[in-house]
Design a protein with these regions (language model features):
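Basic, Lys/Arg-rich alpha-helical nucleic-acid-recognition elements, primarily the DNA-binding modules
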Residues: 1-84
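Short solvent-exposed loop/turn micro-motifs enriched in small/polar/acidic residues
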Residues: 48, 199-203, 225
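Amphipathic alpha-helical dimerization/coiled-coil segments
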Residues: 79-130, 134-137
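Signature of lipid phosphatidyltransferase scaffolds
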Residues: 93-96, 222-257
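Primarily the HKD phosphodiesterase
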Residues: 131-186
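HKD-type phospholipase D/PLD-like phosphodiesterase module
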Residues: 172-206, 211
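Short beta->alpha connector loops
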Residues: 24, 146-150, 202
Length: 257
């Protein structure tokens, strides 16, 4: 078993080849182009996989064997999970993951390859400018905030004005501050039919947002400290994961309007 694991995971070339063949048979030229690899580097990896009967060759076409199909089917979720943590191990290990429900922890491979974004000091509480077009063209936006974000009311109202279905979940203290100290912004949200919710639970993320083409998640540190950095992903499966997270908190919140 260890030799099989070594064969698959100790070579990026072999692993990437198997991932590509999971989509169907490919000829050698397609493989070289897709993986951006020369034949002299590719053929030794193909031979090793053929020797283990993980892939089979039919003329110039390569495909997964029946055993290979089973192996790759089980391998893909693990590969996706490794993509989630690769490059962001420090963030995931030092932040409080308790706000992520267990059923979504088990499906974290759905997040795919994530980006860790750290805003500069002059724009700590501002919405990322490179996501504005994506946000404003979204038909559905679901957000959660445990802290008061000055950008939040106009952003949510703007999306609603554009015809989006907007759901905004707020910590109870944040909601009260918005309603009492920012009455104008609060009324704008109501006028534009933004669905408002109050979340009173003790365990909560710092914030998250899921729109049509992106999701982002911000967690508190394990000692409760605030961190401006956020995890972002753009894959369809990540959006599905983000919508499940949003629904989890909507189901546990009180709807205001």
């Amino acid at each position: 078993m260890s030799s099989l694991i070594d064969l698959i995971f100790f070579s990026e070339k072999r692993k990437n080849l198997l991932v590509q063949l999971a989509d169907g048979p490919m000829d050698i030229d397609e493989i070289k182009e897709t993986l951006n690899i020369k034949a002299c580097a590719l053929m030794p990896q193909i031979k090793k996989l053929k020797d283990m009967d993980i892939i089979v060759q039919k003329g110039n076409i390569y495909e997964l064997s029946d055993i290979g199909e089973v192996i790759v089917e089980k391998m893909l979720p693990l590969t996706s999970l490794l993509d989630v943590f690769d490059g962001n191990k420090d963030y995931w290990s030092k932040h409080d993951r308790a706000p992520i429900p267990k059923h979504l922890i088990k499906k974290m491979d759905m997040l795919g390859k994530c980006i860790l974004e750290e805003p500069d000091l002059d724009h700590l509480f501002e919405f990322p400018k490179h996501l504005c077009d994506r946000l404003h063209s979204s038909k559905t936006v679901k957000s959660f905030y445990s802290y008061f974000c000055p950008d939040c009311p106009p952003i949510q109202a703007g999306c609603a004005k554009n015809g989006a279905e907007v759901h905004l979940i707020l910590d109870e203290k944040v909601y009260n501050r918005l309603k009492n100290d920012f009455e104008g912004e609060y009324n704008v949200l109501l006028e534009n039919k933004v669905s408002l919710y109050i979340y009173s639970g003790k365990i909560r993320p710092s914030s998250f947002m899921v729109a049509d083409t992106f999701m982002m998640l911000k967690l508190f540190g394990k000692d409760g400290e605030f961190d401006h950095r956020k995890i972002m992903s753009f894959t369809p499966s990540a959006l599905e994961w983000g919508n499940e997270l949003a629904q989890y908190y909507i189901d546990r919140s009180m709807k205001i309007n």
